[in-house]
């Protein structure tokens, strides 16, 4: 009986040993499978991360190019707008010049005639009030023109300026160190507003020049 019991115990021990070995093998297989799955998962995640980074990098480069394109486009638009403003300003100045010249030129000849009358020397008691009246009218004309930024100028004694004067005659002499206006046949007019100034009618003058 004791021997049978020992044999049974021995068989159970062997069976348990085999079972333990089998379980160990199963556990090892499971661990290997889990390890492989974990490795595959890690590799997959790494690949997905790399793909995501590549995609983001591509999008970033595309966004940079688009920003540069927009900056270039904005710079061109701004330059075109500045050119448009400059052209518009130049055109406006040109139109205004022509408008002022056209308006003022219609008054200049009558004013010249009145000036000749006003400069008349007379001892006649009958004509004197008339001449004085013309002089007063001229002063009113000058005042109206000045309020409109139109200035009359008589450059006698000043250096000759070909931009605002027209020399109709000249003489040479040792007394002249430079070209100088010695007589004015007809006064000139210019328009001046802030820094904007241009000649409406050049003064017609006689000049003195150094001997050549």
UniProtKB/Swiss-Prot annotation:
One of its GO terms (biological process) is protein folding. Pfam families: GrpE (PF01025). Its main location: cytoplasm. Residues 1-69 are annotated as: Disordered. The keyword Cytoplasm applies. GO terms for cellular component: cytoplasm. One of its GO terms (molecular function) is protein homodimerization activity. Residues 40-60 have a biased composition (Low complexity). Coiled coil: none annotated. Gene3D superfamilies: 3.90.20.20, Head domain of nucleotide exchange factor GrpE. It is found in: Cytoplasm. The keyword Cytoplasm applies. Keywords: Chaperone, Cytoplasm, Stress response. PROSITE patterns: GRPE (PS01071). Belongs to the GrpE family. Participates actively in the response to hyperosmotic and heat shock by preventing the aggregation of stress-denatured proteins, in association with DnaK and GrpE. It is the nucleotide exchange factor for DnaK and may function as a thermosensor. Unfolded proteins bind initially to DnaJ; upon interaction with the DnaJ-bound protein, DnaK hydrolyzes its bound ATP, resulting in the formation of a stable complex. GrpE releases ADP from DnaK; ATP binding to DnaK triggers the release of the substrate protein, thus completing the reaction cycle. Homodimer. This is Protein GrpE. The lineage of its organism: Bacteria, Pseudomonadati, Spirochaetota, Spirochaetia, Leptospirales.
